[in-house]
Amino acid sequence: MDITIQHPWFKRALGPLIPSRLFDQFFGEGLLEYDLLPLFSSTISPYYRQSLFRSVLESGISEVRSDREKFTIMLDVKHFSPEDLSVKIIDDFVEIHGKHSERQDDHGYISREFHRRYRLPSNVDQSAITCSLSSDGMLTFSGPKVQANMDPSHSERPIPVSREEKPTSAPSS
């Protein structure tokens, strides 16, 4: 089997389309068979590479959605248990930190740690933010948005009028 060797300064024509495993969450877990195949394997087709985007889809997807009603962050944390995760709001940022100690897997021993920081939009109601972890390892952080045209410093807010039974003393002049 021929292995293509490329110099580090050589830029591939499809550079951003072909993901590098160096920076994904599977770094250090061993090479897979398709990692050793040349970019375009001529045995199948000159334009086909098996599992071209596999490492992108399985390396811990982070998705941020912001629409009119809510702001949502979805993060793949399948290698972490809820006890390994910490989610905090600091000023206008969401900080998500995950760390687990060294444990054995198929390739030896591994420990993982990540730290992600996202800016919260100014119109997110921080008091109503929720965070949940699904059974398949997706962490979902979401918060509703207040009206987009509302400026907290200049917004109109109704003040309730309450009735008291005793009279107010008149100010002396």
Curated annotation (Swiss-Prot):
Binding residue positions for Zn(2+) 1: H100, E102
Glycosylation sites: S162
CDD domains named in the record: ACD_alphaA-crystallin_HspB4
Basic and acidic residues composition-biased segments: 153-167
Family: Belongs to the small heat shock protein (HSP20) family.
Role played: Contributes to the transparency and refractive index of the lens. May act as a chaperone, preventing aggregation of various proteins under a wide range of stress conditions.
Protein's recorded name: Alpha-crystallin A chain
Gene designation: CRYAA
